[in-house]
């Protein structure tokens, strides 16, 4: 093989930090008046007047090296929050200094809110609609902040103590933390921020249930399913309303609350859930599989682990590597065949994905030719052109639930009573994905209603599957959405959906 270079580990990156350094979190801070701490774009103005979590309300929490609860806060302008010798709160410095060190303490009322004590001054940080202040010797209502994690809500959950990933149990009524690698939809969790319920979090599973503190999954989210987020040396701890922390318990590593103190067993990281997909060959409508050995072959009628492949993007080559559950990569062999033999990502293990207007895609191999399906089902990189034997249909297997976001915000309803969707919301609606034929999917709301195209916009009011869509993977966390009629679902600056005829390059890429 060419270019035996870059081995890839399993760690996908702690996304609570938005892919910054480990232990750096990107957060919003909400005061007692339900307003976000804000760093205005001009004049280094500070206030607590933000209505929702947008760019100006984002803060990077950076750990210090001197204690797990001592942190720094950096604004979206890359300036550090600090308090001067006179008690003025500033955000103008490019560098950390003694006045920019804050100590986190957790409210004792069970709410999980944070108080931020400036280490050099000894006073607590508070906020008003006009400015930030640091004058309180003890924290009151104005000095307690609710923490809104700005990570993508759909994550893999990794235990720091056990060094294993969480997954849905076989019985689908518990979460077990014993997976070596996060494979399949069962390892995907949605960390739901509940602003109206004290800014706590619910852990939502792929089978549409919520984790109760007792370790069981249930359909309805109640008080026992809500947890506050705590920061411990760069890691996350989740505390229930009784003051006990989630951790893996026993030989099955069942995730439940038990301890009232935090050790490594109670700590977690939220990690990127890399896209995992299945492919159907256009020639025989069978799933591509490695079930029968090293040959990559389209010969299966159902999807299992051997028909699911993790797509890992090479940013320098702008191509994809496809990893199997046996930890091997698809690789172009000397004879042009595709075999799952490579344990490294090299040039012959990288493929370009080319999307077509009929919802199919093609793979271009390192030899410049397209993957074609032989009558036996075997894949060979021998096709000079894109014909039926070089077409495949794509399903995003480990996203049975989608959360979509664009530059304007999350996808959600215009108003609670209005079933039209907009894409400029501060909070999101989860979207259920139902697979149909030849890569087509139907999108469904929790109400049981389906997405329907209405003119150039989207309504969620169809009683049965109506309009289908194709999902096109463009980056590890971005997709384009194309209607059956070939138009892309686009986002306008005012937050409205619009079906566009724009080409592939200009289509809206939705973060998922």
From Swiss-Prot:
Supply the alphabetized keyword list: Actin-binding, Cytoplasm, Cytoskeleton, Developmental protein, Differentiation, Oogenesis
List GO terms (cellular component aspect).
actin cytoskeleton; cytoplasm; neuron projection; neuronal cell body
Q: Does the keyword Cytoplasm apply?
A: yes
Quote the InterPro entries the UniProt record gives: Actin-crosslinking (IPR008999), Fascin (IPR010431), Fascin-like_dom (IPR022768), Fascin_metazoans (IPR024703)
> GO molecular function, one example?
actin binding
Task: Provide the protein's localization.
Answer: Cytoplasm, Cytoskeleton
Q: Which Pfam families match?
A: Fascin
GO biological process terms, semicolon-separated: actin cytoskeleton organization; actin filament bundle assembly; antennal morphogenesis; cell migration; chaeta morphogenesis; cuticle pattern formation; dendrite development; epidermal cell differentiation
| Function comment | Acts as an actin bundling protein. May have a role in the asymmetric organization and/or movement of cytoplasmic components. It has a role in somatic cells during the formation of adult bristles and hairs, and in the female germline during oogenesis.
Description of how the protein assembles with itself and partners: Interacts with Rab35, with stronger binding to the Rab35-GTP form compared to the Rab35-GDP form.
Question: What protein family is recorded?
Answer: Belongs to the fascin family.
What is the name listed in the Swiss-Prot or TrEMBL entry for this protein?
A: Protein singed
Q: Which organism is it from?
A: Drosophila melanogaster (Fruit fly)
Gene (name only) = sn
């Amino acid at each position: 093989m060419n270019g035996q270079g870059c081995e890839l580990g399993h760690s996908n990156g702690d996304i609570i930090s938005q892919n910054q350094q480990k232990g750096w979190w990107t957060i919003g801070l909400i005061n007692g008046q339900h307003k976000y701490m804000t760093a205005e774009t001009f004049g280094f103005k500070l206030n607590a007047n933000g209505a929702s979590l947008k760019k100006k309300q984002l803060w990077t929490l950076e750990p210090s090296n001197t204690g797990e609860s001592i942190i720094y806060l950096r604004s979206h302008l890359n300036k550090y929050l600090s308090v001067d010798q006179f008690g003025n709160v500033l955000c103008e410095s490019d560098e950390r200094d003694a006045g920019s060190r804050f100590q986190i303490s957790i409210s004792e009322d069970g709410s999980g809110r944070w108080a931020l004590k400036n280490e050099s001054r000894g006073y607590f940080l508070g906020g008003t609609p006009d400015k930030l202040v640091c004058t309180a010797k003890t924290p009151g209502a104005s000095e307690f902040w609710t923490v809104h994690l700005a990570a993508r809500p759909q994550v893999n959950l990794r235990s720091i103590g056990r060094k294993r990933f969480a997954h849905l149990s076989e019985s689908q009524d518990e979460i077990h933390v014993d997976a070596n690698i996060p494979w399949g939809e069962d390892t995907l969790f949605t960390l739901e921020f509940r602003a109206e319920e004290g800014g706590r979090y619910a852990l939502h599973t792929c089978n549409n249930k919520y984790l109760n503190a007792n370790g069981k999954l249930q359909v309805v989210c109640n008080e026992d399913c809500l947890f506050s987020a705590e920061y411990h040396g760069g890691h996350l701890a989740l505390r229930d309303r009784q003051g006990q922390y989630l951790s893996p318990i026993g030989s099955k590593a069942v995730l439940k609350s038990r301890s009232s103190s935090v050790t490594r067993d109670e700590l977690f990281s939220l990690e990127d859930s890399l896209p995992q997909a299945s492919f159907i060959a256009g020639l025989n409508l069978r799933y591509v599989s490695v079930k029968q050995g090293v040959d990559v072959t389209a010969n299966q009628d159902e999807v299992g682990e051997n028909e699911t492949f993790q797509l890992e993007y090479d940013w320098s080559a702008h191509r994809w590597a496809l990893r199997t559950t046996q930890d091997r990569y698809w690789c172009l062999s000397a004879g042009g065949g595709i075999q799952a033999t490579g344990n490294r990502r090299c040039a012959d293990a990288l493929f370009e994905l080319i999307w077509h207007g009929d919802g199919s895609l093609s793979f271009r191999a390192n030899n410049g030719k397209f993957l074609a399906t032989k009558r036996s089902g075997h894949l060979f990189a021998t096709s000079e052109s894109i014909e039926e034997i070089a077409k495949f249909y794509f399903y995003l297997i480990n996203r049975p639930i989608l959360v979509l976001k664009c530059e304007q915000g999350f996808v959600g309803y215009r108003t609670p009573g209005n079933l039209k969707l907009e894409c400029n919301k501060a909070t999101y609606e989860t979207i259920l994905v139902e697979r149909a034929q030849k890569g087509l999917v139907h999108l469904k709301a929790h109400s049981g209603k389906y997405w329907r195209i209405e003119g150039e916009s989207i309504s969620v009011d169809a009683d049965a599957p109506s309009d289908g869509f194709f999902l096109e993977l463009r980056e590890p966390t971005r997709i384009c959405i194309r209607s059956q009629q070939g138009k892309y679902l686009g986002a306008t600056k005012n937050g409205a959906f619009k079906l566009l005829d724009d080409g592939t390059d200009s289509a809206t890429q939705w973060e998922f």
